[in-house]
A protein has these predicted regions:
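Active-site neighborhood of phospho(di)ester-bond hydrolases with catalytic His/Asp-centered motifs
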Residues: 32-35, 53-60, 81-83, 139-142, ...
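Glycine-rich phosphate-binding loop signature in dinucleotide/nucleotide-binding domains
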Residues: 47-51, 130-133, 196-198
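Histidine/acidic-residue-rich catalytic or RNA/ligand-binding cores of hydrolases
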Residues: 213-222
Length: 286
């Protein structure tokens, strides 16, 4: 274990009442990501009275940042740090929530719950290049234009969704590619940036600690290229879902594939890739 590891803890918010789906990260006086509003009781229970000074959000997707506004009501002293491109949506979340409700329909409330506005005076926009309590901030677009990653002085990197989804060690690593602003070229550059840091461990939201970052980062880069090749082939939604289900379930473990598909709905993955192809495919180097 490296210096400072004893101050770093994954916080399981038990999304959809199941463990091992969404992790926040407790590090010194900071909470990195907080999960959706629906998991707020689990988050507070897991924190067991501990109160951070700062909430630092890797990006504003609901599974990472949904509870942020509710936490500012719970903890009046809490300051929230987020990419500049996402800050205004947290101050005035009505359009963001309405858009998500159109996508998820009747599932929205069960999956995420509503957003509470964050007072602008408690929002701190980030551009990348800042250092916050030993956490070096980097602008890392690709999964989202408003995504940041953090390299801690301990050697840990907290990477949100840039390093993809891998629910348990030894399982496949794959890229969550929901609409609207997937950019595979930018994403690969962000993965390369994190790899250049040579982190000792990764803290990923879905899910937990990656003890050996180098092969994991290579695996997410490989999956991004595979996804680009798939969508360029003209594959349809149903065939894409079938291919990914086989990959995630190891060709037979359908229940495990379903766990991944609940965490990242495969139909939305397809829609995000299709949008990327239409917007960036002609200019992409992938």
């Amino acid at each position: 274990m490296s210096a400072g590891d004893d101050q770093i803890k994954a916080v399981d918010v038990r999304w959809m009442d199941r463990p091992g789906r969404i992790a926040g990260w407790r590090i010194r006086d900071n909470l990195i990501d907080c999960g959706p509003t629906t998991t707020l009781p689990h988050l507070l229970h897991a924190l067991d009275g501990w109160r951070p000074k700062r909430l630092i959000l890797t990006h504003i997707h609901f599974d990472h940042a949904g509870a942020a506004g509710a936490l500012t009501r719970e903890w009046p002293e809490l300051e929230v740090y987020v990419h500049r491109r996402g800050a205004r949506h947290l101050a005035s979340p009505e359009r963001l929530e309405a858009s998500a409700r159109r996508v998820f329909g009747d599932e929205f409330d069960a999956r995420f719950g509503g957003l509470v506005p964050i007072p602008e005076e408690r929002l701190h926009p980030l551009d990348g290049g800042e250092t916050i309590d030993g956490l070096r901030i980097a602008d890392t677009p690709g999964h989202a234009s408003h995504h940041i990653c953090m390299l801690d002085e301990s050697g840990w990197a907290f990477v949100g969704d840039v390093a993809g989804v891998r629910l348990d060690p030894g399982e496949p690593v794959f890229a969550p590619t929901p609409p609207p602003d997937i950019d595979i070229d930018q994403w690969l550059a962000s993965v390369a940036l994190v790899a250049e840091w040579r982190p000792t461990r990764l803290g990923i939201t879905h899910y937990g600690v990656v003890e050996d970052p180098e092969p994991h980062l290579a695996a997410i880069a490989e999956d991004l290229r595979r996804e680009a090749k798939l969508i360029r082939s003209g594959i349809g939604t149903d065939d894409y879902v079938s291919v990914m289900t086989d990959m995630l379930g190891g060709g037979g473990a359908r229940e495990r594939a379903a766990d991944y598909a609940m965490t990242v709905p495969l139909g939305q993955n397809y829609a995000g890739l299709q949008r990327w192809l239409e917007r960036h495919g002609a200019d992409s180097q992938v």
